Amino acid sequence: MPSNGDLDRQIEQLMECKPLSEADVRTLCDQARAILVEEYNVQPVKCPVTVCGDIHGQFYDLIELFRIGGNAPDTNYLFMGDYVDRGYYSVETVSLLVALKVRYRDRLTILRGNHESRQITQVYGFYDECLRKYGNANVWKYFTDLFDYLPLTALIESQVFCLHGGLSPSLDTLDNIRSLDRIQEVPHEGPMCDLLWSDPDDRCGWGISPRGAGYTFGQDIAAQFNHNNGLSLISRAHQLVMEGFNWCQDKNVVTVFSAPNYCYRCGNMAAILEIGENMEQNFLQFDPAPRQVEPDTTRKTPDYFL
């Protein structure tokens, strides 16, 4: 197994946006799997920690996030999924986050988003990018196999519940979530799917999601869930919000989105949420990093409900 020195060299290489070799990715994913298999569906996290939303392959904006929030391991991070697809640098982005996880396992928590799936990545860019950068699909397979092991949710100091998407009509308690078998491809429906796909909504109760997966849930649902589970807040990602963060549902829910100028065209700010040693909350907003020369690519990304 590679030493910390090897990992440090790989992280240094990735910070320059240079992909690892296929063999290094395979070894890295093996190491990461051994760590993630020991983690929980509701992974406990201590404060202080900085909570981040979608990244979507926007590598230089991830570097900007670290510049604004502090580098690992000096800052503890919790990422709420969607590392790949849409941006130009999914390979480098997910490689860096996984390498940081392996190097600093207790300082970094990486959750699963709806894009950490075999099916979605074949449509929205990660699969094609792996083919283009490596000449075969092996790296795509190593990462998508690893994605099955990512925790679904995290719980900061038993108070702030973090996940990619939202709530599920099948899950009333955190113990319900703890009892799920997560080590599988994201299903098309059911509680695991809902956690990664659902969205808060202005209407009360449960609704049909326009995304075709998951549900919409109202303020009444979020307030009841928080009350039942002794929570102060649900922190989630999954939706573009123009200021980078957005409170909703009487401050029972906050959306954090960390990909500025999403898809290189949406004009939004990004944000991260710092949770301090006394659970105080501070949002840091940031604009896109200066544009790098984009790689030669004529990929057409299908438009899709944001």
Swiss-Prot record:
Q: Where in the cell does this protein reside?
A: Cytoplasm, Cytosol; Nucleus; Peroxisome
As for family, the record states: Belongs to the PPP phosphatase family. PP-2A subfamily.
Task: Tell me the gene name.
Answer: PP2A2
**PTM text:** Reversibly methyl esterified on Leu-306 by leucine carboxyl methyltransferase 1 (LCMT1) and pectin methylesterase 1 (PME1). Carboxyl methylation influences the affinity of the catalytic subunit for the different regulatory subunits, thereby modulating the PP2A holoenzyme's substrate specificity, enzyme activity and cellular localization.
Output one GO BP term. Answer: abscisic acid-activated signaling pathway
So where does Mn(2+) 1 get bound? Answer: D54, H56, D82
What is said about its interaction partners and assembly? PP2A consists of a common heterodimeric core enzyme, composed of a 36 kDa catalytic subunit (subunit C) and a 65 kDa constant regulatory subunit (subunit A), that associates with a variety of regulatory subunits such as subunits B (the R2/B/PR55/B55, R3/B''/PR72/PR130/PR59 and R5/B'/B56 families). Interacts with B'THETA. Interacts with HDA14. Interacts with SRK2E/OST1. Interacts with TAP46.
What keywords were assigned to this record? Abscisic acid signaling pathway, Cytoplasm, Hydrolase, Manganese, Metal-binding, Methylation, Nucleus, Peroxisome, Phosphoprotein, Protein phosphatase
The record's SUPFAM superfamilies line, in alphabetical order, gives: Metallo-dependent phosphatases
Q: Which residues bind Mn(2+) 2?
A: D82, N114, H164, H238
Q: What's the protein name?
A: Serine/threonine-protein phosphatase PP2A-2 catalytic subunit
Could you tell me the EC number(s) of this protein? 3.1.3.16
Does this UniProt record's set of keywords contain Cytoplasm?
Answer: yes
What is this enzyme's catalytic activity, as reactions? O-phospho-L-seryl-[protein] + H2O = L-seryl-[protein] + phosphate; O-phospho-L-threonyl-[protein] + H2O = L-threonyl-[protein] + phosphate
Tissue-wise expression: Expressed in root meristem, emerging lateral roots, leaf vasculature, stipules, guard cells, anthers and pollen grains.
Per the record, the major location class is cytoplasm
Gene Ontology molecular function: metal ion binding; protein serine/threonine phosphatase activity
Where's the active site on this chain? H115
This chain's source organism reads: Arabidopsis thaliana
**Cofactor binding remark:** Binds 2 manganese ions per subunit.
